Amino acid sequence: KSITKSEEVLDNYLDKQDGVYEVKENTDGDLEVTAPYQTKRLIVESDQVKDTCGASEVYVNEMDHETILQYDSEEKTEEAFQQLSRTYSSCYPDKVVSIEDSTMGLPLSQGGENGQGTYSWGSDYMGLNELKKQAASSGYTRRVTVAVVDTGIDTSNVLFAGRKVSSQSYNFFGNNHNVQDTFGHGTHVSGIIADATPANVELLVLRVSNNEGKSSLLTIKTALQYAVSKNADVVNLSMGFIDVNASLYDYLDSTIDKAYNRGIPICCAAGNGEGGSKGVDV
C-alpha cells in the first residue's frame, strides 16, 4: 500500500527517536505506533538454540523447551529476530501486556456495606452474599487459594480485614515478596474477590507489573507457572494485550493447559479493554 503524507511525517519523526517503531493504519483509518522490540527480549520455543545472535543474557528452560534471549538494544533485538525467525518458526519478541487502569479512582467500598453483606454492587447484583451465607452454614472450612495475577494489593483496605494473604505471594517484577500495589488495579480485583467470597478463601497475590501497570508475556507465563506450582485452586487474570497474534496465544496455552489438567480453573476478564480499546482481553 502507498504511504500517506501523515505516515511519512510520522515515520520521519520516529526515525530520529531511540528504539524501533512500526506505524500501521488500523481499520478506522487511524495511525497506530507500536514498539515491538521494547522489551529487548526474544522467546524461542526450542532449548537447542545454537546461535543466540549476540544476546547479552541467555536462559534455557528445558522443562518447557524454550530459550529466552535478552539484548542490549531494540535494534539488536530486531536484527536477531530477523535472523532467528528464519530458523525457528516459533520465535517472537516478548510482548508488553497492559493492565487497564479503568478502575483507577473508583472506590472499592462504595461507602460501606450495602445491607446485603457485601460492599460492591457486583457482588450484590449476582447474589454472592447468599453464596457466602450458604458456604458459612455448610461448615466448609478448607482453605481455598485464589491466585491473583495483577498489580499487587493494598491490604490496608477495609475489604481485606481478617483476610489471609499468602506468605508465598510474590513480586515478579521486583523479584521479591513485596506485593504492595502502587497502581491500584490489583487491589480492586482482589477486593472484588474478597468481597464475594467467605473468609476461608486465601489470596495468593502475584504482582507482575511495574508502577505504570505494564507487564510482559514472559512475566505473565512465569507467574502462571508459579501459581500452578503452589497448588492454587483458582487463578484470576484481568489484563489486555496490544497487537496480538496466534503465536502469543499458543505460548500461554501450554501453561493454561497444565493448569487445566491439574483441575485449576483460570478466570479471565471480559470487557476489560472497554468499548474503544484495540487490545484483546486475557
Where are these regions (language model features)?
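Autoinhibitory N-terminal propeptides
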Residues: 1-48, 89-103, 126-127
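Protease zymogen maturation seam
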Residues: 31-35, 58, 62-66, 75, ...
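Active-site-proximal beta-strand/loop segments in catalytic clefts of secreted hydrolases
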Residues: 45-47, 94-96, 148-152, 195, ...
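Helix N-cap motif at beta-to-alpha junctions
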Residues: 48, 71-78
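Second-shell loop/turn segments in exported
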Residues: 69-70, 177-180, 210-213, 242
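Extracytoplasmic/secreted envelope proteins and their assembly/folding machinery
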Residues: 78-81, 186, 190, 221-224, ...
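Active-site core segment of subtilase-fold serine proteases
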Residues: 111-202, 222, 229-230, 234, ...
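Substrate-binding/access-modulating region of protease and related hydrolase catalytic domains
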Residues: 140, 208-282
